[in-house]
Amino acid sequence: MSVKLMMTWDIAPEREQDYFEFVIGEFIPGVQRLGFQPVEAWATIYGDYPQIQVGILAEDLPGVQQVLRSDGWIQMQDKLLALVKNFSYKVVPARNGFQF
């Protein structure tokens, strides 16, 4: 069964330019190389919710767990964590439409 890796975070103040360069230049291509398929990205413009939410599609739960333990993922996550705060993730069964 397909699953989604749902991630949320807030962009760290004063790091916006570095953040966007990293996401476009490294993060998106990196998750694709690891076998994930980015399917959605949302930005919160009002309210007390995470600023960014990203949904990444994966084939199955064991595959996600394996990638999340890989050196490639850990290195990318470390770079992301230097640019964001309040990072959180969960793996949920994939379905169409908005998931939170």
Where are these regions (language model features)?
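Short, surface-exposed ligand-recognition loops at beta-strand->loop->(often short) alpha-helix junctions
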Residues: 10-22
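Active-site-flanking beta-strand signature of metal-NTP-handling nucleotidyl enzymes
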Residues: 3-10
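Short, solvent-exposed loop/turn elements at beta->coil junctions and helix N-caps
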Residues: 41-44
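Charged, often glycine-rich, active-site loop that binds/positions anionic groups
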Residues: 53-55
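Short, low-order "capping/linker" segments at domain edges
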Residues: 92-100
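Residue-level signal for secondary-structure boundary sites
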Residues: 15, 62-64, 97
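An amphipathic, aromatic/His-enriched active-site/gating alpha helix that lines ligand/cofactor pockets
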Residues: 24-39, 57-92
